[in-house]
Amino acid sequence: MILRNFSFGLIVCLLAAHPVAAQVAPALPSRQELQPGQTLAPALAPRDPSGLFEQLPGGPCPFLGSDLSFTLRTVDLSGLPLEWEGIASEAWAARIGQSISVAELCTIRDDVARLLLARNLLARVEIPEQKIADGTVRLEVVPGRFEEVRVTGSAPATALVRKTLEPVTEAEHIDLNVIQRYLLLAADIPGVVLVPTIRAGSTRGGLVLEVAVDRKPVTLSLGGQNFNSRTQGRISGIARLSIDGLTGHGDRTTLLASTSADFRELQVYQIGQEYRIGAEGLTARGSFTYAIGRPGDVLAPLDLRSRSLVGNIELAYPLVRHRRRNLSLVGGLDLVDQRTRVFQTLPFSREHARIAYVRASGNVSSRYGDDPASLSASIELRQGLDILGAAEQGSFDLTRPFADPQATVVRANLGARYSPARNVSFIANGFAQYTSSALVTYEQMGIGNLSIGRGYDPNAAPGDRGAALALEVEFGPIVRTQGIVAPFVFFDAVRVTNLGPRGYSDTLRSVGGGLRGNIMNRLDFGLTYAHPLDPAFPGGPRADDRVLVTLSATFL
């Protein structure tokens, strides 16, 4: 306690002598700074099998060239499952009572198959041999079903792919909502590359799903960016190595290292592991992060040393898995230990937090008229727990003595994209956080270059609660032989509130524009000019303009 008070008093004296440093809190690394992998380009999405299912051909039209015609009175559709009856009448409703050629029966036949496919039922529609005497036409629906799934390949996860696809053969007819789920779950297995093909089976309406399994066992990503503050090292680099499918149980091992350019201000090391449990997509994940920091620039005279240990375990389950809509549920536990020392040895702060959380997240893509649109959202409930040595509210060694390590926090994210024209897209992303308590450093709402608030240093204005919104207009993408590029302009706005005895609110806004793109499907880049409109802290000068650069390349 005496050392803590001595350290705090010494820091106050030194900061008072340096007005710029006084505005830079000797805080621990934020949550965003301890997750540098987010600055790398996301992994390539699994192959979308949307083109796999096409309308089953009804066969050649036997009436082409015929001059025969008749008055259509009704259509008798047989072979359709009960739950699908009545949805195909649109194919012939406009022709009832009209004189049509017999060749138009093939058009009706194909339209019925198209309507069924739009309702996710894959079926073949046939015109059986018949005599049309009273204007009644008989059509027969032969619902497709998978007789067999053939999985080939030597990848360790081949057995897991086969087990994941087993439910495909259990359905009486092919419901694309069900089939897509299992194909996408199989494609989600780490390190697996699937090439599915549909072939005719040996029975009427029977199909065979052939899946060739290839393996991509190792992925290496290297990247760099200049998003950080001067105290944490403006420029940093990151390397991430993913090793997939070592055991055949849908496993992925991830090794990550990040460091400031001079290997001094902040270094982060992380190891992660995930496994599939069963064949329905349930995934167990765990990770451990070790970070050491030695802030420089105006904080260098304090010789601050920080150490962060973050452990995480979680379970994730895909409630809905579809190429156009997804919903997942995640539950987990964060174990956070962070400490700061001044002059290398004098204790200044120590924070031990144990946070349980549950999160629901989803996305949907569709069309608004003829224009593509997408929406994503998540909501998360986090609860600090008094277990495993967690700090208590009022502990003298917390960075914020009035913070509550057992606080309840609600977080929400929302994203939307709408493209009303071929080369123009409107993009909105936002997040909000609410709590009634002052929070420990790790739980605070971080804003800045690593989230929303481009042009401001990461964690420039941490908050206990608040909201942030990023609006963009993207032009393009402009496609060339060697790559693509998309110019954009943006407006960011953040409002944060800090609770506690010295609580305050702050608003940060910025505008700017830039380019993002990809070269040769390997190098992702981003270049952004950001012009802050507000001071980084109340009463201070307006933050300086920033040119932000990010690069990431994927190998192997």
Positions of predicted regions on the chain:
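Transmembrane beta-strand segments that form the barrel wall of outer-membrane beta-barrel proteins
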Residues: 218-228, 239, 250-261, 269-271, ...
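Outer-membrane beta-barrel "beta-signal"
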Residues: 241, 515-517, 543-556
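Periplasmic polypeptide-binding modules associated with outer-membrane biogenesis and secretion
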Residues: 2, 23-228, 240, 258-267, ...
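Repeated loop/turn-to-beta-strand initiation elements of outer-membrane beta-barrel proteins
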Residues: 218-220, 247-253, 279-285, 322-327, ...
